[in-house]
Amino acid sequence: MDTVLMATTPPIRCLHASIPTVFRSPAIYQVSCRSSQLFSYRSTTMMSMCFLRRSDLRSRFLSTPKTTSPMRRPRFSVGASTEESSIPSNRNLIVANSVVIVALAVANRVLYKLALVPMKQYPFFMAQLTTFGYVLIYFTILYTRRRLGIVTNEMMDVPKWRFAIIGFLEALGVATGMAAAAMLPGPVIPILNQTYLVWQLLFALLILGRRFLLNQIAGCLLVAVGVVVAVSSGSGADTTLSGIGFLWPAVLVASAAFQAGASIIKEFVFNDAAKRLEGKSLDIFVVNSFGSGFQALFVFLLLPFLSNLKGIPFASLPSYLKDGAGCFFNTGAKISGCDGAPILPLLYISTNLAFNISLLHLVKISSAIVSSLTMMLSVPLAVYIMSKPLPYLPGGSSLSSNFTMGCIVLVLGLLLYNIPTTPTKQHTKTS
């Protein structure tokens, strides 16, 4: 749920979600199977015994009653294999969704760049339009699906305070990210943003109780390194953090942590709802609607701070938004330089909506980490496309050899993450 900050990576959605070749089918089968089994009552309670006994983070989200069956203390190891699931694999669906998401993510980044051609003076207006406009769209869809019986009363009864946490973390991530991006040189921002995947691994361990193989951890790190090398291949790639200090890089890393935490909590909501709904899956528009609604609420409370970060005095914000609306609809004789509106902005918004819905669906059927890896594949593809002459962007640019090297490292990381493994006898017994 996130698209306000386009300083480093194009918007995933305005403030909603700010993230990831298609995965090989054996790998996807492995990921999808593990996520379903890991959320059983037994695995959740077992992991809670061996990790963070004093302040169990997962117990703050779990509200289902504990089982009374005897519990065994598991042996925790980062290199241990996750339990295999007996649920049939939906890897074909994950592959199809991954392909769609890569295509939509590339289109999303390119169209955002094109949308800023007429809206180059009003990027903050675009951010607020998507933030608050998406709330109206999502709740309209949710209301329609509720009337059609697709969304049930049980789905609407899921705890709403979890969505409040999601919205708060995403809004806080946007605010801190904007503050840090204003103080940091451009080339270092995508590098620091790759800590997002590292935070996801950590929060999946703490909140979901998930265990990762060493090849999965190494694969995620390789993907992050590949993105850094590919994105930082431009003329300003030699810019370093020297002379910047520790504060603002730390703030940007914290911003990635907030958004990564929100993505993992979304995954937790889907898995916990499957137990509450007796095997039925939670409709994604319940999560999108309430998550976006709470995010918009917190963004509204932070508007004075956010507008000042963009150099817009809060007292001048109404007139700025009015001029932005005029440029968006390309009306008014006083507004110039808005050629391409409203077609280009509307193309971006419609693509961004489809992208956000598809991305959340991938989180639902696989995991937040799989969605992030899919997203990261789109980064070099989008950079390559935007280096070519485009309508309204005829210039184009050349890419260095580092770009190719970064893409190779990224693909190797994806392959390493998805290496199929054979469960040992011990792991089979614990399933």
Curated annotation (Swiss-Prot):
It is a multi-pass membrane protein. It comes from the Eukaryota. InterPro entries: CRT-like. Pfam families: CRT-like. Signal peptide: none annotated. Disruption phenotype: No visible phenotype. Clt1, clt3 and clt3 triple mutants are more sensitive to Cd(2+), have a decreased level of cytosolic GSH, an altered systemic acquired resistance response and are more sensitive to Phytophthora infection. Clt1, clt3 and clt3 triple mutants have decreased lateral root densities. One of its GO terms (biological process) is defense response to oomycetes. Disulfide bonds: none annotated. This is Protein CLT2, chloroplastic. It comes from Arabidopsis thaliana (Mouse-ear cress). The gene is CLT2.
